[in-house]
Amino acid sequence: MATAMDWLPWSLLLFSLMCETSAFYVPGVAPINFHQNDPVEIKAVKLTSSRTQLPYEYYSLPFCQPSKITYKAENLGEVLRGDRIVNTPFQVLMNSEKKCEVLCSQSNKPVTLTVEQSRLVAERITEDYYVHLIADNLPVATRLELYSNRDSDDKKKEKDVQFEHGYRLGFTDVNKIYLHNHLSFILYYHREDMEEDQEHTYRVVRFEVIPQSIRLEDLKADEKSSCTLPEGTNSSPQEIDPTKENQLYFTYSVHWEESDIKWASRWDTYLTMSDVQIHWFSIINSVVVVFFLSGILSMIIIRTLRKDIANYNKEDDIEDTMEESGWKLVHGDVFRPPQYPMILSSLLGSGIQLFCMILIVIFVAMLGMLSPSSRGALMTTACFLFMFMGVFGGFSAGRLYRTLKGHRWKKGAFCTATLYPGVVFGICFVLNCFIWGKHSSGAVPFPTMVALLCMWFGISLPLVYLGYYFGFRKQPYDNPVRTNQIPRQIPEQRWYMNRFVGILMAGILPFGAMFIELFFIFSAIWENQFYYLFGFLFLVFIILVVSCSQISIVMVYFQLCAEDYRWWWRNFLVSGGSAFYVLVYAIFYFVNKLDIVEFIPSLLYFGYTALMVLSFWLLTGTIGFYAAYMFVRKIYAAVKID
């Protein structure tokens, strides 16, 4: 068994690997070279809000539309994310300035919003919706300049520039609602080095926007769709009254700036984290947890187990040794098959399926092969990998089921292929019905749902059956001791051996090893933030695997010392105890970080959180179970049994 020092070289290797790969970026698309005055298309992605968790497509609001609306063909991940990428009427030319242009205005007439349209726009503004646009596949960002005091005299301040994804649809002030009806686009380009006789080409490397609200009376528009912006602050914002019709102009301006940023580094603006030190603190905290558990394991194995096994193997004092060491007393029952072996093996098979999928996704993303420029690639890859990993889940479930004296392999394979995926599909279908009712773009379209079902029954199910068949035919795990025909009576257990107490005790340390990273993951999921520190995430995942394995071994050792041989289900449940703390943290995050008050957004949050907790429990429970199973087989194989 590995000690704390055994993990040191591996930790150093992973640290170096993470440092080398955290900034590594493999583009998902080829660069586009623009010439002077080439059109740069501005597309809309969706509207999002952390208060409602319901995305909407861009033209669900009365924005100006082009003569022909064209939606981009999307992959599975984009559809599941609620993206609906569509063209817009913004006319942007490479390196060509525009001071002010009016959208969808005919003969110098403003746009009139009906009462229903005004009510809808006002509702979206009060719900704090953001608009997401892209130019050359780069998402638009709003620059935020934050000032922090460096000295106690408050004279020196440091400017911290951060970027907010998308731009706010509008704002409220003293019970009045205002719409951002003017967009100042700032696009940065990098001039490519060319031969002397060749024309210069440009590449877009950043896309910013400054949203403004300008009242109709303060904008001067002419018949050529040009307009004049008010100077300085001599203007009032455009109010939206939800109880009546509103007239306004939709306008925009374009400004170009040359940048030293190269095309390969253009995503750094969105992916660079200002709180990397917090991630390092998380890693150090996690390593300390692993070393602490390694120390406990070393003490158990070196001092206790080695001494117990040596004493037990002495032929002249077997009876006395058995009386003083509880874990050896249950050698005839420790491998007795548990209740419901089919369900246990099915859940563990799904856990193996999840483990393989997550490990590959994080590793591939860490290498930069799932770049954010390939929209939806991460989710698409995860879905397909989970289906194809069914062969490994089926194989492990089939072999374990046979080890537990199971005989109905076809039923077991069906249970493995449908139990966990069926629960996930059922919850998602119910939540999707509510999303459909809100006419959100986050609702999975019916054809996509049919396609997912076809992939489930056409790919995942056959692969699970195939793996289960070969796993069931393979030689079962060789248990080192025989099982007695008559079960041994289990003595009364102390209060701290209670299953729920065990879950609380076993879950706290693995959760402590990853809770800081969990905060950033929650921010990415629920607050529409980018997360691309997969180097950190990969290292945290490895530490989570090690800590779950270690705590599982410790818990099963103390259970066997208490002469309780019913460790199969208990260890699976206890090893997934960190999922309980994930649930507690999710509730804390909902109460303290999110401003969700309506029923359907709350239902969506806790519905998806339930899926996350269930999946995390399967993952950590499976890791801990197999670590404990290997440990139990190892220690009983070292004991001589007559």
From Swiss-Prot:
Organism of origin: Homo sapiens (Human)
One Gene Ontology term, aspect cellular component: membrane
Key words of the record: Endosome, Golgi apparatus, Membrane, Phosphoprotein, Signal, Transmembrane, Transmembrane helix
Protein name: Transmembrane 9 superfamily member 4
Membrane-topology annotation of the record: Multi-pass membrane protein
Function as written in the Swiss-Prot or TrEMBL entry: Associates with proteins harboring glycine-rich transmembrane domains and ensures their efficient localization to the cell surface. Regulates the assembly and activity of V-ATPase in colon cancer cells via its interaction with V-type proton ATPase subunit H (ATP6V1H) and contributes to V-ATPase-mediated pH alterations in cancer cells which play an important role in drug resistance and invasiveness of colon cancer cells.
Membrane side Cytoplasmic: residue ranges: 303-346, 398-416, 471-501, 557-570, 620-642
Taxonomy, superkingdom: Eukaryota
Topology Extracellular: residue spans: 24-281, 368-376, 438-449, 523-535, 592-598
PTM annotation (Phosphotyrosine): residues: 312
Assigned protein family: Belongs to the nonaspanin (TM9SF) (TC 9.A.2) family.
